[in-house]
Design a protein with these regions (language model features):
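Basic/polar low-complexity intrinsically disordered segments
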Residues: 1-206
Length: 206
């Protein structure tokens, strides 16, 4: 039914333009003002449909951006982690402090926690020199930090997009109900009032 918004608009405009039936329409409770109100309901639905379409597009884009940011952080972290571990393979305490002990995490929350721990401790004097010699420079750590922040922002945008979709869907559905309730009543009146004038009903698409 929602997809019939355009057809509803065509019907209402055809009725508004039909001067031959104007007097009977007004007498039946459908003066120009009421028909204009009906057209306003149709325009409100069109606006709500556009909002829903935009929300769908925003959510799709947000999901795509999140996947890209997720992959970028995983790839960068895996490289930095491997280089960092190679500097402290015989120092379990250092590995623990830097968040490098055990297997590489796969869960994103664990990865983000491990990245945060590495970024906090890598600049400390006990670790910075060795890490730099293995290629884990300040610039490389800054790059990792940027990837982490990009993922956090992508997550925020994704959640915002997800929460927006139900709201605009409810708005669309409410607008559709108001319009089509109005249209059902109008069509019932029109069929009764103009049952002897099928040509008029045909002009209106009823």
């Amino acid at each position: 039914m929602i997809n019939d918004s355009g057809v509803a608009g065509q019907t209402i405009r055809a009725v508004m333009a039909d001067t031959e039936a104007a007097a009977e329409l007004t007498a039946g409770g459908y003066p120009p003002e009421e028909l204009s109100r009906g057209l306003g309901l149709q325009k409100a639905l069109e606006s709500a449909l556009a909002e829903r379409q935009a929300a769908d597009g925003a959510e799709t884009a947000a999901n795509r951006a999140y996947k890209t940011a997720d992959k970028a952080l995983r790839t960068t972290y895996s490289t930095v982690r491997g280089l960092s571990r190679s500097a402290f393979l015989k120092d379990p305490a250092a590995l623990e402090t830097l968040g490098l002990a055990g297997r590489e995490p796969r869960d994103m929350e664990q990865i983000m926690g491990a990245v945060d721990r590495l970024l906090k401790n890598a600049p400390l004097p006990d670790y910075a020199a060795k890490l730099t010699r293995r290629g884990v420079t300040a610039a490389k750590l800054q790059g990792l930090q940027a990837k982490l922040e990009a993922l956090q922002e992508a997550d925020r945008v994704q959640e915002a997009a997800k929460s927006a979709t139900p709201k605009v869907t409810a708005k669309r559905d409410a607008a559709a109900k108001v319009l089509f309730d109005w249209l059902v009543e109008f069509k019932a009146f029109a069929r009764a009032q103009f049952k002897e004038r099928p040509d008029i009903l045909k002009r209106w698409g009823i």
